[in-house]
Amino acid sequence: MVAQVRMGVRVLVPLGRSKTYTAMAMRLHSDKPEFETRPIIQVIDAEPVLIEQQLRLWQWISTYYMSPIGDVFKAALPAGLKAEENYRPKTVRCVTLPANLRSEQSLHMALTILKRALKQHQTFSTYLQLSHWSEIDGETPPEHIAEIACDELQNAANASDAVLRQLIQRNFLELYHREVGRLNTSGEYHPERIQPLSPAQHAAEDSIQEQFNEKNVVLLHGVTSSGKTEIYIHLIKKALDDGKQVLYLLPEIALTVQMTRRLQNVFGSRLGIYHSKYSDAERVEIWKKQLSSEPYDVILGARSAVFLPFTRLGLVIVDEEHETSFKQQDPAPRYHARSTAIMLARMYEGAKVLLGTATPSMESYHNACTGKYGYVQLTTRYKNVAMPEIRVVDTKDLYHRKMMRGAFSPDLLEAMRTALSNKKQVLLFQNRRGFAPMVECKVCGWVPKCKNCDVSLTYHRSMNMLTCHYCGYTYPVPKQCPNCESTELLGRGYGTEKIEDRVRELFPEARIARMDLDTTRSAGAYGRIIDDFSCGRTDILIGTQMITKGLDFSGVTVVGILNADTMLNYPDFRAYEQAFQMLSQVSGRAGRRDERGLVILQTKSADLPVIQQVVAGDFQTFAHDLLEERSMFRYPPFYHLVYVYLRHRNEQLVDSAAIEMASRLRQAFADRVLGPDKPAVARVKTESIRKIVIKLEQGINLPLARQCMAEARTQLLQDKRYAAMTVFFDVDPS
């Protein structure tokens, strides 16, 4: 068995009396370990399921993000590769001729016998027609005798299961199961379908190629609808012409649905798709194909696609690089796909990374301004289509004058009416799902809260339930207030469900759809909603941040941002950055073809500089002001941030542990440590949470800093009082 163990193969190891775990052979050595070992009882793989570059990347993720390598292993591998019995190849029931019937004489005899059973005779004759038996000469080797899927034969012959079963039992047909792939590998490569670039796009592509000669990472900063995707397609073709593979990362699965069609139209079966909406078995097959002699040349996927094996990676594209969705939150490893993709490219000689966005993250923009990254700008929309008009509506004044109709201002309603009368489409953005963000007693002000978490419950009218968006727990809606027994319980605020309800009242003739987490849970839901809107089968699409991220809808002329204040008032140092990005991105969905779009931006904070900068499309001024603040108050990109979280069911215990942990950290980092403090949501899933912030200046010895943090955690957990405490680090939080 020792000879079978190689780097990258899976092995089975017994832990305890009855548990067996799948482990990965990471390194072969003869050093005596400092811990008790367990014997390997089975080597699962004949060939490695991981390659050297993956192992190195996983080790980097484990080290940089301070996460156990086992957590990286669990996050990276599809579940079907974690234990051999979890994955089963997909098979199809097929029939073929038994060996004793593969001659004209024996077939003639079989048909004669079957004349007494008319339906069996018809089904057997249909098999011979489908298999083109009459065209096969007597010299055809047995393995080339046609095999027909049972479903195909039964449909063609209109035969029941019983008829087919009788033919098999009487040995007129032979049944077997043929292994088939779950993946769609159809479609030819059509480079001639690639659209020619405009002069501005051509200049941008040339500049990217030129800067790739000196820089490994280039930031493409192009306004919305400037044609960045077409530049990506040209760069992908060049990489394929050079015999290289391409990884194309997108932040949302919804985007991969629309992008898949564009890329498949050109790259056909050379394109593979990888994200969490695929079944586990499909992801296993993609993984195995990437290890085969004929892997996909282009992989399009969400953040987990960085874990796939590549043998000749040449280009990584991170589209919408600013998106916080690229950062994994829970569970560990809490990696950022953008940083991980850059590190992945370093594992391959000559591989380059292109970051694309209309609204760069402060980290990427700062790296471009300081020369660490290359920088290319696209300042005009494709075909010189005008940027949308952004009209700010001060809802504070309108609410005071009682001119609002629910969440809708007169300006927005008028714009929607005009668009619909002109057979155009409307996009409405509300970044809260559910019907009402909270329910409140009109008499005493009681608000129902989650019993597990420190949050109010959201009312979902479609289920008639109150739901916690943190732990998922649901509660029936009370008939009366438990505090004062009043029956006047009112929904406060507007979720996407309530907006949809109001829009149906205001525009009863319009075809309306909603796109949020609740409507996209089922397989194919993303595709159906996007298809219907793209093809004009939907007039008004209401959505959360899912609709802000790079989707391309040609018929949209009006975008309504119902409440910009929820983004601006979030208690986080990135709130304005993310608000600018989201508002600019959703505005960019308007007027992407021939007609100038209109954006109605509703806010009670119309005078804020960030709102004015969104209206003017003035990213440079916004970034300059924000970077000055970040530098002054010691935030990224000038400082590294590490959040230390402590969680436990006993609030007093987590308080004392947090104080002690902060004290230990201050011994190493002095005034770089802030806290402990309660986060915005201080209890989740019955556990109280405390947070410590560590700010580390650029140039600090990060390996030593990580060592000090890890030692502080180890020392804390050695105290018996805190042995059951959960303590983890969030490096570079988003």
PLM regions: where:
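Inter-lobe coupling/hinge segments of SF2-like helicase ATPases
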Residues: 192-198, 202, 206, 214-655, ...
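A short catalytic or substrate-binding loop motif that flags glycine-/basic-rich loops and adjacent residues
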Residues: 17, 433, 686
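Short helix/strand-capping connector loops at secondary-structure junctions
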Residues: 38, 689-690
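Well-ordered beta-strand positions enriched in small/hydrophobic/aromatic, beta-favoring residues
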Residues: 11, 92-95, 123, 390, ...
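A carboxyl-terminal module marker
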Residues: 663, 667-688, 709, 727
